[in-house]
Amino acid sequence: AGFAGDDAPRAVFPSIVGRPRHTGVMVGMGQKDAYVGDEAQSKRGILSLKYPIEHGIVSNWDDMEKIWHHTFYNELRVVPEEHPVLLTEAPLNPKANREKMTQIMFETFNTPAMYVAIQAVLSLYASGRTTGIVMGSGDGVSHTVPIYEGYALPHAILRLDLAGRDLTDHLMKILTERGYSFTTTAEREIVRDVKEKLSYIAPDYEQEIIDTTSSSKTVEKTYELPDGQVITIGAERFRCPEVLFQPSIIGMEAAGIHETTYNSIMKCDVDIRKDLYGNIVLSGGTTMFPGIADRMSKEITALAPSSMKIKVVAPPERKYSVWIGGSILASLSTFQL
């Protein structure tokens, strides 16, 4: 969250609401009935954490309202009545959801005006393009969204219910095979941090497995847990995000992100495919793994016609490119609410 025209968000925090597991545990702390974002994160040991956004779509409106309240009053410190608001939504977000979002903004927060933009379109704007295909992957969902001259092509949007949270769960599982135990919601957050700091995508998965088992290449790294214990992580570093290209690893019958991107392009008019292949833009936190652009390029080249020029763009700021695109859009003079 932040202000139009800024080049980076003022506030970045997880969409989490935590409630005390036991009432009255925190004696003398003036216990609140709910904690949001980083505060929920830091007190996670005594809280039960909930995620009001599932697969990119809001599923718990009361908690979502708490998050927005926290954003306005605690993070940005603004009075919502005084500011037009730009919100973003997942591709193919149901109309009822958009209406509910609008209703809360106008009735609960009394915002003077609002606009809802599609996340992928904003990411594409942030990369300086108006035509291309965005492969966006966050915490709960991934989408491939072809965009032509600034407009998303709904018939060709594909959704893949595989994203950051699934990778964290998979890493929890494969670290358990190594003899470490991570089970609670609090421990899941530790594993998420391990994933973000140490994972990478192998250029060639099979070869990487061979190289690391034959010990010609060591990929082992250490990570210190909050309690001081040090764990070692090796092949898990690339086994975890490989799921993006091979969902079958976690028992999912779905196409990987490369094949989903290809399928999305194939649903578009034959005349615009060349423009899409040449402008594949990655966006979202789950595209932050080192090696992802090269691997994506290699996999799509194998699927596409041999003469096709393929370009995969992974902007360094892609974790926040949706927000940056929103900042650009909301500060345009043509965009007057």
Curated annotation (Swiss-Prot):
This protein's major location comes to: cytoplasm
**Sorted UniProt keywords:** ATP-binding, Cytoplasm, Cytoskeleton, Hydrolase, Nucleotide-binding
Disulfide bond entries:
none
* Catalytic activity reported: ATP + H2O = ADP + phosphate + H(+)
- Give the Enzyme Commission number: 3.6.4.-
Q: Which GO terms describe its cellular component?
A: actin cytoskeleton; cytoplasm
Query: PROSITE patterns attached here?
Result: ACTINS_1 (PS00406), ACTINS_ACT_LIKE (PS01132)
Q: Could you tell me which SUPFAM superfamilies the record lists for this protein? A: Actin-like ATPase domain
Q: Where in the cell is it found?
A: Cytoplasm, Cytoskeleton
Q: Which InterPro entries match?
A: Actin, Actin/actin-like_CS, Actin_CS, ATPase_NBD
Pfam families named among the record's database cross-references: Actin
Q: Does the keyword ATP-binding apply?
A: yes
> GO terms for molecular function, please?
ATP binding; hydrolase activity
The miscellaneous annotation reads: There are at least 13 actin genes in potato.
Q: Give the similarity note.
A: Belongs to the actin family.
Q: What this chain does, per the record? A: Actins are highly conserved proteins that are involved in various types of cell motility and are ubiquitously expressed in all eukaryotic cells. Essential component of cell cytoskeleton; plays an important role in cytoplasmic streaming, cell shape determination, cell division, organelle movement and extension growth.
Q: Output this protein's name.
A: Actin-65
**What organism does this protein naturally occur in?**
Solanum tuberosum (Potato)
